[in-house]
């Protein structure tokens, strides 16, 4: 597939290292100021950003038109071009999303725990910002504002590295954000967009820029996430795949199962929370398998199944071993009959990606076991896998979904963009 020109905008590697080091130092200083900013000031800054994005709409759309034209000339797919394209309505939605972040509760300064020791020490655990968040994303220019706003709300600075195809648009949005921050008396450098398309800049960000970057969040395809996870010298909040399962267990209502399966798979096939595998319990296969497969096929979804699923409908093609570990991101699903709850859990453990998995059943004991034993960031009972979203969780927005075990897991919203410190209050105690 043709790609956009990724040639460095800079003269040599030394220039790039100097540029990135300066961005890191300015972000660290801005992050310190943001960490100390009162909640009201941060919210004023976010509302000023939203106003400036609206005021800058003509400039943003002009730069977006240039990005879209270049993408079309490079032969990028219609799906990528659609993600890249903005219009007046989409720009307005970007501004509105920033305002919604301003309306969230401040995650900084909350008392997470408090206790008194036998020696009279009073100890508090208090939420504090992470510091500097590096966000590396591809073709969605709205990520500039979405991710930046979440970082700012949590008292962080952000270094944003846009994909080459959205670079001009992201630059225009980031400029509006910096201007809004300055109007509110906050450091404009709390939002910085890497001003080069050079992929070497990503490598420098992954080193942590000499201790100036505290965490990296990649937003993009598998190749980007694989590179970030392999090369990063700082913590990463990310997921590699969204291989999500819907398990129709014994005790499942057929009507509910049909509705939840179609929503989990077909509402939006290209998102990480879309179901990729259907598991049907052998105890209900005789009554549930055929109508569920027919519903998928009639909705335009191709089905790749095991022998039992192929026998249910001649339109089902044979599944290979690779299908059970494939994130299709398309109107395709693999389907299999399993011999009970233990077999379903074992299949998910062997083939899943620890993202989102669902059980459909009226058996509360079986549901409790599934929710307890399936080791995924999100597990649902009688609910669509496509609820794997920060907005649906009431987080207001998300910077991504994390499937790792350290710090953030599931939707990464403003609370997950904080860490904590301990405050210890004494009255002259010394340690014996």
UniProtKB/Swiss-Prot annotation:
The keyword Repeat does not apply. One of its GO terms (cellular component) is cytoplasm. One of its GO terms (biological process) is L-proline biosynthetic process. CDD domains: ALDH_F18-19_ProA-GPR. Pathway: Amino-acid biosynthesis; L-proline biosynthesis; L-glutamate 5-semialdehyde from L-glutamate: step 2/2. Keywords: Amino-acid biosynthesis, Cytoplasm, NADP, Oxidoreductase, Proline biosynthesis. It comes from the Bacteria. SUPFAM superfamilies: ALDH-like (SSF53720). Disulfide bonds: none annotated. It catalyses: L-glutamate 5-semialdehyde + phosphate + NADP(+) = L-glutamyl 5-phosphate + NADPH + H(+). Its EC number is 1.2.1.41. InterPro entries: Ald_DH/histidinol_DH, Ald_DH_C, Ald_DH_N, Aldehyde_DH_dom, G-glutamylP_reductase_CS, Glu-5-SA_DH, GPR_dom. It is found in: Cytoplasm. GO terms for molecular function: glutamate-5-semialdehyde dehydrogenase activity; NADP binding. HAMAP family: ProA. Belongs to the gamma-glutamyl phosphate reductase family. NCBIfam families: PRK00197.1, proA. Catalyzes the NADPH-dependent reduction of L-glutamate 5-phosphate into L-glutamate 5-semialdehyde and phosphate. The product spontaneously undergoes cyclization to form 1-pyrroline-5-carboxylate. This is Gamma-glutamyl phosphate reductase. It comes from Methylorubrum extorquens (strain PA1) (Methylobacterium extorquens). The gene is proA.
